């Protein structure tokens, strides 16, 4: 009636709520490989890219482990007798559906991740509840499926969501992702990846020493590998700033969906996008702050994901109703 909710600009972020679980009561469980939401699409694009470069398609991996999430396994799957070479995760015996979350530099707790979406006016649109050990970029698809038909034009997220898969997902659906700047994770004293220029015509990278890094292969993670000539690099004056490899070969990777990331960078540099991203602190961050300060959202007294979902739904519904009541009071409307 009053068109209070504007679904064209959606802000997405996640916060963590401490679970009702003792940090000392845990067991190790063998980590199981969880299928990514874009795995099949990526595999097809990888094989198509390899065939375009004259290479054979990759064979499927033999995986005996069934995909598993943060805490849906039975207690029979937990054991203290884990082989040393197996990758394990810590699982609470009190609340198995929670996840082991790194809260600070030296602090870990069992927690739940609450991924939330709101509009530019601070109205909470939807949410999902996940184990605290799952990364935001992996859980995004579950929330996005709930937001698919609301008329979203811009999706404003933080650096944790800045991945080629999410960029492709949004752009293919006609939604503009608004990502922040993410600094390069390069060692001090070494050239950044941006200093290696991609030559699209020759499908090669050009290093600061003005030499080519030619295509080598496309790996299972979806990255094309471009390698330099070790004999040329051995005599290069920039070798100490380029690579520490014993054979003096520099490897630069480029994702098969890197074009989507470049489109997102163009969007980031568009006029008005920086101001739009700055509204996160007034919208989604404000919601989390209010929930933690006024509604006991720092921790939960309930066990299990289902009860946690109930708590979050009730809290967010109350926050929306309180916001609506204040709006009506300001407008002088009767509460009917």
What are these regions (language model features)?
Residues 1-336:
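Anion-binding and metal-coordination hotspots
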């Amino acid at each position: 009636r009053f068109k209070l909710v504007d679904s064209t600009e959606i802000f997405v972020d996640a916060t963590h709520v401490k679970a009702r679980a003792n940090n000392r009561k845990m067991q190790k469980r063998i980590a199981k490989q969880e299928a990514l939401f874009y795995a099949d699409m990526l595999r097809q694009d990888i094989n198509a890219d390899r065939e375009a470069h004259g290479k054979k398609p990759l064979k499927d991996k033999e995986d005996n482990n069934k995909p598993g999430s943060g805490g849906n396994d039975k207690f029979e799957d937990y054991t203290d007798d884990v082989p040393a070479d197996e990758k394990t995760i810590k699982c609470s015996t009190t609340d198995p559906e929670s996840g082991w979350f790194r809260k600070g530099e030296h602090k870990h707790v069992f927690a739940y991740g609450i991924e939330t979406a709101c509009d530019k006016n601070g109205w909470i649109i939807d949410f999902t509840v996940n184990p605290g050990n799952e990364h935001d970029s992996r859980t995004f698809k579950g929330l996005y499926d709930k937001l698919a038909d609301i008329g979203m034009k811009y999706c404003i997220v933080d650096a944790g969501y800045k991945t080629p898969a999410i960029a492709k997902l949004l752009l293919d659906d006609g939604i503009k992702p608004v990502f922040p700047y993410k600094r390069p994770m390069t060692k001090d004293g070494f050239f950044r990846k941006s200093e290696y220029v991609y030559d699209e015509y020759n499908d090669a990278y050009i290093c600061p020493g003005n030499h080519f890094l030619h295509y080598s292969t496309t790996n299972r993670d979806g990255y094309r590998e471009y390698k330099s000539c070790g004999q040329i690099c051995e005599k290069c004056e920039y070798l100490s700033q380029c690579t520490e490899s014993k054979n003096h070969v520099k490897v630069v990777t480029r994702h098969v969906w890197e074009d989507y990331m470049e489109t997102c960078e163009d969007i980031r540099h568009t006029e008005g996008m920086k101001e739009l991203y700055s509204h996160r602190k007034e919208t989604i961050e404000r919601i989390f702050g209010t929930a933690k300060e006024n509604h006991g959202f720092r921790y939960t007294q309930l066990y299990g994901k289902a009860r946690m979902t109930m708590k979050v739904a009730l809290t967010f519904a109350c926050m929306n109703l309180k916001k609506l009541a204040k709006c009506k009071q300001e407008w002088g409307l009767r509460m009917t």
